[in-house]
Amino acid sequence: MENRITTLFGIRYPIIAGGMIWCSGWRLAAAVSDAGGLGLIGAGSMTPDLLREHIRKCRAATGKPFGVNVPLMYRYAEQIMQVVMEERVPAVFTSAGSPKTWTGQLHAAGCKVAHVVSSTKFALKSQEAGVDAVVAEGFEAGGHNGREETATMALVPQVRAAITIPLIAAGGIATGRGMLAAFALGAEGIQMGTRFALSEESSASDAFKRLCIGLEEGGTMLALKKIGPTRLIRNDFYTAVETAENRGASAEELKELLGHTPFQVLMGGLLGIAVGLAGAWLYA
């Protein structure tokens, strides 16, 4: 099929694999791009040197366009952006910050730019900043979510009515039926995170993948609103977080509770302790 998203990124299908930290390395990005979509490398858990390595391996593995997702609040964001521009990555998806800082520089380096938003207000600001496309992500998404808690079904048509640039829908989409629904709401492409996090090429542990595949409705909950709304699997760790929040734990206490557990889960297990849908702390 052909539309503004496929034309913008030079892809066959308007399907983007979200650049999730700890899950989206060069293997997953290359596989998605080879299949006709747009694979993204998740830079939010990488050092600049490691990202450069992933970019070069991805480019060697596929002749198709690919991209990098950069959370703008990441401590290495500036160095990561320098790597992205030096390597002339075809597409850059930004999130968790203002796109105004980098969009012009990325365009000058030949990169197409999309920004992830959770509200119409920030979609308009992104358009004003000059991005090429917007990803409207509803709060059904795994990992970090917007504070507005607007569902994809409500968010996408409102954003579509407000902006003129190409629109990508995200959050709770995992099948062709979900893609069809997103298009009916006005989207021209979709971004999926969890579905690709559970693929063979994902870096997440097999135990984590099996757990997520077995989830049913009600198996995930939104938590951690003091430090950034995050969708977590409903298990012992979620109960510990909920208990801490109910007693009024500070943001600092919640951060200490989190520690590095999500990384341990994704890479090796500890499934009874902590886990988030598509990984706690994943940018989907």
Residue ranges and their predicted role:
Residues 264:
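Divalent metal-coordination and catalytic microenvironments
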